[in-house]
Amino acid sequence: MQFNFYKYQGTGNDFVVIDNRNLSFPKENHGWVKQICDRRFGIGTDGLMLLENTTDADFKMVYYNADGNESTMCGNGGRCISAFAKKLGMVSDNGTFLAIDGIHEFILKEADVQLKMINVDKINIEKDDYILFTGSPHYVSFRNEIDKIDIVSEARKIRYNEIYSKEGINVNFVEDLSADRQEKDGKIYMRTYERGVEDETLSCGTGTVAVALCFAEKNNLEKGKVEILTPGGNLSVSFTKEGSIFTNIWLQGAAKLVFQGTIDID
């Protein structure tokens, strides 16, 4: 079978996007999804997204990890599929889509996409680390000099421990750059190991949101905008905290079409 595809990236987190409004893509064939995502035998991507029709919003987003399995919310993927919907002429400069965790609003401004995320009402603290759900599950650990950490090795100790091994968890290591005066504007730097990809990715949208909220929790911030540096580029997260609940959470950053083409799936 042959399909048209579009390759997008949001701060280095890359995705294959397919217009599946005619429901022709065989979603039950996880092997095909895995093949498309393979960087040697397919197109190569962190995940695959299908854009489909829905009566609840402008469109529906269906997201698969690189391992071929349908997964939870992907923030950078949400920003990229919003840009794709505009390319298809389905929306103009704003709209909504239905994802696995509910309805998301988005705003498109030139190359940037702002995406509203779900509210977060609980952050668990385990010693000095944080566990929370921002559409996907995340483990956040503040460390020093994270570029010296073997991310894959260290993250797998957490991702595959007896607590998280069954469902999996994304693991984020975070460094406060303002703490050692490398940055004057309070930026923080993060690296992420993603379940389903089972490797470090250049960026993670739901992870960026998780890190921003943990930074806010750690520093008693009730509202504001946190600038975050990832290996793939800059993202920002704005939020308001009402009591113990984080609301009005917006993830912002670039989303770009890299190339498009057709692929034959055997």
Identify the residue ranges that each predicted region occupies.
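A glycine-rich beta-to-alpha transition motif near the start of alpha/beta enzyme domains, typified by
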Residues: 1-110, 140-266
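Short, flexible, solvent-exposed loop/turn segments with mixed acidic/basic and small polar residues
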Residues: 5-7, 128-132
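Active-site glycine-rich loop that binds ribose-phosphate moieties when present
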Residues: 115-128, 149, 153-158
